[in-house]
Structure formats: structure tokens, C-alpha cells
Amino acid sequence: MCADQPAVLTQHRAIAAEGWRIELQTPRTFLESLKVMRIGAKEVAEHRDGLSLLDPMVVWLSRLGLFSRSEAPKPDSYAITGQIKDFGVKLDSTPGFLWMVSDGNDRITQVNAGRAYARVQLAATAHGVVMQPMQQALQEFAEVARPYADVHRLLQASPPAQTVQMWARVGFAAPVG
């Protein structure tokens, strides 16, 4: 967490924003996300993997055939710039971040990190804490090399000996239901 360290929190937010922007404005990476995007409750229930998107406007655009998963929006389109702006507002209100760093990066380590994150997510939820993974800056494509290096430096993880396996923004939300 970093709510009591405003300068560190600002760095986390800036790296997350840059990773988000790069992924959205790089057509091939945006298309990767579209391929695993689950739009609406029905798709989420049918496919328990991938990215869940429940925004009513997007659900209706998809139902009407006006939301393409085969073509990325132009980087300067409202679909992209609007998401970047909206997410910037969310990041600005983020009170903290959580991260998991491992020694090494073999498949067993990756799976164990995922299992540990799932346990943390469940415990956090039980206490009213919400988490959103910020994996954009942890990916390994050329365009995101700078945010990747920045987040590893910020978290004092030295690749390849150490890997940031999970990085999430955390905060509080009203109970659902």
C-alpha cells in the first residue's frame, strides 16, 4: 500500500496510466484484449475466463452488432481517449497499490503467484477492500518496455532474478447487494 507515501503513490498512478494508455493505443495489444473480452452477464457466465465488461452502453452496442472485436479503434478515437480519460479519474482516486514479487519466473512460480493473489483477493473482499489488477505495465511487448522497467524499479525488483507477478490498485467500495 502507499496511501501514507504520496510521492510513491503518484509514481504508481503514473506508471499504471502509462501502461494503460500504451495497451489501448497499440492496436495489436488492444485486439488481444478484445479476443478475451466477455461483454454482458451472459458471456461472463458462459466463459469464466477473460476480461469482464458489464457497462450497459457497451452491452447494448454489442447486442446491436455495433461493437467490433475484430478491429481495434483508432488510437485517437473517442472509444480510446474516453477510456484513457475515465481511467485517469479512477487512478487519481486510488488510495493504494498491492504487489507480489517473486524470485524467478518459471511456470510453477507464476501459478503459485496467481493462487496467492486469488487468496488475497478473497480475503480483501471479505473486508470490503476491492482490487483491480494493473497488468498492462507488467507485459513484455516492446512498446511497454519503459513502464515495465519503471514498475520493477519502483518495487525494487531486479529482472530477470525477480519478477513482479501481480500489481493491483486497491481501495474500498460499498457492499454489493
Residue ranges, per PLM feature:
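Acidic, surface-exposed loops and disordered segments
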Residues: M1-G177
